[in-house]
Amino acid sequence: MKKMNYLLPEESGEMTLSGITTLRKIEQKLRNLFESQNYQEVMPPNFEYVELYTGLDAGFEQEKMFQFINHEGKSIALRYDFTVPLARNFALSELTEARYSYFGKVFRKEKRHKGRRTESYQVGTELLGLSEVTGDQEILGLTFMSLEALTLKNTIVEIGSAAFYKRLCELSGGDAQLFSELLEKKSLSGMKAFVDKHEMIGAPRDLLLALMTTTDLPTMKKLVLATGDEKLSQALEMLEALNLPDKTAICQIHYDFAMVPAMGYYTGLMFQVYVEGVAQATISGGRYDKLLKQFGKTTGSIGFCVHMDNVVKGLNND
């Protein structure tokens, strides 16, 4: 008789019984919270046409999708992302404003040594139809309430701007890919070599060298003002309009001016929440106004995602 192989494939995600119990408890807390804030739970399909993701200017990597051919000969992918299907549904509706919540898994091919899961469980919200500052403040407020419900300790909320990042890339001397990699790695020595290579001097040089070490808005505003760049100033003005404190009762709030967008469709505010002892973000979110335009609807949109596997890790570390 052939010997059975009982090993799980690398792509599988598995959780202990105690982990499942913890997950279900916090899942219910978040569901109750979202319902209390009028976020309607929706359940997008597990399968989508590959073209839904690749046909958008959203930075999706097709090689990370789990794909197969259906009975009609069309390319299908396991759910790669929640935001895109929900944005599509909203754009095709007659609604002018919507609040959605979701609970489910996404599937992306990831290398295990990077600490990311190929099969990950996500809980999240999408707010569609509100203007930038109003929508940003509501989603950040809901994020803080979610942190309180999760009872995570020693949390840091990092605030960034996709508009700020994209303008920096435009000013990077035609070497945007390397520039982005340096930001993502937080490589101070690499950035020093970068500005030397491009012979940057004065205010632009000072700005780039300060990106990874500056965590307060007033200091960064002075550095940007010295460059005279209007787009960079506008991006910081949007962050300033949020009027965020340095900390709340449940978390510290830092600015990360070197933050690289986790999703290619982000256009404005970005944020990530980290908890002590967990390398990856427990919550991530951002504004994605241009995504809806690709579906023919022009309005504000922002959301966030709770990475439940990382939350369970954080709670186990407490």
From Swiss-Prot:
GO biological process, one term: L-histidine biosynthetic process
Gene Ontology terms: cellular component: cytoplasm
Cellular location(s): Cytoplasm
Listed CDD domains: HisRS-like_core (cd00773)
Pathways involved: Amino-acid biosynthesis; L-histidine biosynthesis; L-histidine from 5-phospho-alpha-D-ribose 1-diphosphate: step 1/9
Record keywords: Amino-acid biosynthesis, Cytoplasm, Histidine biosynthesis
Superkingdom of origin organism: Bacteria
Further remarks about this protein from its record: This function is generally fulfilled by the C-terminal part of HisG, which is missing in some bacteria such as this one.
Biological function: Required for the first step of histidine biosynthesis. May allow the feedback regulation of ATP phosphoribosyltransferase activity by histidine.
Assembly, per entry: Heteromultimer composed of HisG and HisZ subunits.
Family the UniProt entry places it in: Belongs to the class-II aminoacyl-tRNA synthetase family. HisZ subfamily.
Protein's UniProt name: ATP phosphoribosyltransferase regulatory subunit
The encoding gene: hisZ
